[in-house]
Amino acid sequence: MFITKPENFSFRNTIHSHGWSELNPFAIDEEKWRLKYVFGGNEFSRLIPVELSETNKKVKVEFKGRKPGKKDRTVLAAKIKHVLRFDEDLVDFYRLVGKEKDFAWMVKTNSGRLLRSPSVFEDLVKTICTTNCSWAMTKIMVSNLVEKLGDVHGGLHLVQLLSEFGHLCPGRMLRHLQPGLLE
């Protein structure tokens, strides 16, 4: 499957924009420049592991396993556009930063989009894990949550299960969240 990308889009700059690609359940292959993720949840009929890469004018979506049906592919395309921020119109942003000597490089490199998670909940959990700690501790906390409380599919951890954490007692969640306790 291919998704047409916006004119001013850089796959590499977006996936490396602020570190989200380093946090589970995203996985990045920097040799082949692929971003891996398993989509799932109530919107899909099943779990859908994908690898995203860039072609000339499109983002290539490779399915790992059975190809999803038409309805799942439609929802998946919308989620991928959301994750890569295709819906962000950066024309005014580029016009403003293009006037500034120190920021003109952003226009030339199509920078400015920030990778985000498919759900607000996942972004919220990750943002909370960045508060008042180092990046190394953030990575440990997010990994502990995803790896200890999520499922694995095709070698990748599923984060949509984070949205189901409400049924867990706070003590159990804290044991998994605290860095270094479950090494």
Placement of each model-derived feature along the sequence:
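HhH-family (HhH-GPD) DNA N-glycosylase catalytic core used in base-excision repair
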Residues: 1-183
